[in-house]
Structure formats: C-alpha cells, structure tokens
C-alpha cells in the first residue's frame, strides 16, 4: 500500500502478471470509514491494509468505475467482511441494479473465475452527481465509451485534483460494444478538468498534470487507430502509428505486438525493426493479442 496524498492510497498497484485492476482507498477519518475505488479480482491485496493498521470491517463504501468483472469481481468477499458495505455504479452498467458479466467475450476470458453478481446500493444517474463521505466529496463524471456506464470519480483535496478514472486507457472497439465517438467526447471532457493526479485502472498513478493530459490525448489517437486497423487489418501505416503511440506512452509490450505483426505483413519494414531494436530489452511480443482482436471483429 502506497500513500498518494494524505489519506489517499493505492492498495493494489498494477502488475502485468497479476489479474485484476488497480485498487485505491480513501480514509475519510469519519464515521464513513474507508472508501474503496474499484475492488479487483483478489481479496488478498485488500487484506493487506490490515498491516497498515486498518480494520477491513471499516471498508464501508466501494465506488465502481465500470461494469467489467476485473473491477468488481471480489465485491462479494468485501460483503462478507462488512455486510453493511455499500456499492456504487452507474445505471447503464448496473442494469436492474446488478453488476454481472453480460459480454460473451469477457465471459470467455473469465470462464474459470467464480464470482457473485453485485447488487448496487446507490445507482449513479446524473453526470456530476456528488457523493459525500465525511469531508470528502467525489464528483461522479459519466465517461461512456469503454462501457456505457463508465464513471470517473474526481476528488479535490486541499492540494490536488485527483481523478480515479478506471479504464481510461482501455481498448474501445465499436464492434465489441465500445463507442469510440462517446469515448473521444468523454476524454475531451476530462481534459478540461485540469487534473493533477490520474489514478488509472491498469497503469497506476500518472502525474503531474502535463503528463496526465498527454496520456489522455494519446489514448484518443490510440483507439482511433485501433478501430481503423480492425477495418483494414493489413494497413501497415496504421500498425506503425499504433506502435509509435504505444512507444510514446511507454507501453513497450504493445510496441512489440504491433511491430511484430507489421513485419509479418511487410518483412522489410525498417521503421518496425528500428522500433523493436529500441526496446529489445523488454518482454517478448505477444502478437496473439492484436491478432485475436482482429479475428473477433472480422
């Protein structure tokens, strides 16, 4: 567990070898106890807060950024720790006040994972709705695109504007239920917030403000290019653009994915080979990732 600012923590950092999302926590220092932002898939990282002197029964609220199981799968275990815990999610993801797997692709990915659907106690209906816990106020910002009911939670402390954004760099594919047009509008909305610290679902903490802004702008470009690639799977220019954007974002595994795939199509691509040479000390490529996305959508 790592302190971000006073009373705000990252409980489970991103680890590419461990499934689930990043988990964040705010100690309200009030009768509202501890507020978790997303819960992940595994209870053990959350249990670790006990080592820092926290009682797990004091987790009284869990704000869920969107309806993908890697962000809420362990919620039933949180309920076992505190039967009075309240869960929060947007109405467009929590259909009939319940979060459960509805996407067949995600169901296949988590076929071996046992979970219980999550009953949502407080449905977020309106953009900019305020949730107040002790002296802490979370503004609920509806950011559809990755899912229809994606929500970012903005927390303003005395010194920083902190955004808990869920899967802001998530893959947004129109043919898989994403909405690229909505996603672009959502990111543009967030760019106007002057965020100091962005607490992301799969990339940890991004700061300062200039870096957070660069990250958001780059991911608009990434998803625009990714959707183009699905339409034109052999377009080497688009593949190279995706590799270059990934390089700027320091997503080196993605660089290898796109360059390796590009070299299958155009074996003599000097640009692709040069990028691979730049990052050859990083993990080997996983070309199946991009191949699978294209196959699923064609």
Model regions: which residues?
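Metallo-beta-lactamase
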Residues: 42, 130, 137-223
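Active-site HxH/HxHxD metal-binding segment of metal-dependent hydrolases
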Residues: 41-130
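Accessory terminal helices/loops
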Residues: 184-197, 201-298
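Hydrophobic alpha-helical positions that pack around
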Residues: 84, 143, 250
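Conserved beta-strand hairpin/beta-sheet module of binuclear metal-dependent hydrolase folds
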Residues: 1-52, 152-168
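Residue-level marker for buried hydrophobic side chains located in beta-strands
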Residues: 35-37, 63, 87, 162-164, ...
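Short Gly/Pro-enriched turn/cap motifs at secondary-structure boundaries
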Residues: 13-15, 119-122, 142-144
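Short, charged, surface-exposed secondary-structure boundary motifs
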Residues: 20, 96-101, 173-177
